[in-house]
């Protein structure tokens, strides 16, 4: 289990069962499949409560972004692993590049991918290879599943949840597959 926010947790084993279908066959999972990945507090178990819980978390994260050096970028998310904080930042449509950056206690590293700008147009392999290698976190495979789970969660519920559409039109959370520098050596700046 991965705790996303207080009452919201993702079941990694359930996620792995639909991973192949989503990425290899390019078939979007159904809403009930997505929600079945998550485990909630018994007092927050409805579809609407899950959206409310996640949206509240995202709003809190956005409000905490005060780094002037990155004022031209959008803060996509704020995450903590083992009490270490990281910021995921993107500038989706600037200069026809999408930048995903993790900055914080863990590392300070940027990967840039030339157009197409919108990440949903990238191939599954490119999506999986985009996320930087978070070498200080220990279990890289768990971090990989965490990011992909976020992507599926947002993709699944955004069709019916305006609260989650507002910030994620042009970016998806992606996971690491192998060494991105080695696999796509000419892709990243």
UniProtKB/Swiss-Prot annotation:
PROSITE patterns: MYB_LIKE. It comes from Dictyostelium discoideum. Residues 121-172 form the Myb-like domain. InterPro entries: Homeodomain-like_sf, SANT/Myb. This is Myb-like protein T.
